[in-house]
Amino acid sequence: MRLGLVIEGGGMKCAYSSGILDMMMDDGIKPDYVIGVSAGAACGASFVAGQRDRNRRFFVDYVERPEYMGWTAFFRSKGNFFNLEYIYQDMTGAGGEDALDYDAIMKNPCELWAVATDAETGKPYYFNKSDLHPYDYSVYMATCAIPIACRPVKINGHLYFDGGCSDSVPVRRALEAGCDKVIVILCRTKDTVREPEKHQRLYRTLLRRYPKMIHNLDVRHEKYNRTLNAIRKLEEKGHALIIAPEKQLEITTYTRDPKELQKLYDTAIREYPHIRERLLTFCEDHIE
């Protein structure tokens, strides 16, 4: 039985996901396949590396630094509201202040994937851990490059934006990879109905060089709602288990308040016992 783990993106809302992942680490849950989107992909990397509390530190301890995000970061990084180079190169790379354990990821037999969106084609591109380098985590810069808030990231001659623009919750990809069961971590309630993107005039102007990206954002809510409906049906059949906030989060993608982000992390810790028994039964063959 092959077990997958899918982690939705959501910027700072993924502080919730980080709490869930820490509790899963404590319970010794070991999936065969992990795929994440945007901040969810970065959270998945720390999970596969076995670095408990690392994700929380990035959401809570470092968030107020001017280099991290905000207008200071925007001007220092020449156009990124999230200073992706600071987060995923300076901090995360080998020798960085809170480096990702590259060796642990490579030694772990678990597959690790991150979704980005090709800026020219608008299609998802799936990076795996063979694309990582201890001194270069451009993959995570790419999957987190939110349109408008960030410039696209170039990898091997191609430009990429946030993976959520093309495959927000990549459960189908996990199933195609041979997963029999999939744990899905959301940072929205499981009954969420996503609305059309706001600021359409703004993104249509700023992304005019990337018409496929504009189309993706125009229809993103429709695709997301279809995907979530399909996942709920998989859960009814016993092929998926959804872990999601019990109430809609007040945190936004761009929240910088460390107290609020710590509360969100703590919310995940508090809610985890409500799903724990079902989760342990669901993945009973993948617990060490």
Residue ranges, per PLM feature:
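Patatin-like phospholipase
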Residues: M1-V37, A45-E288
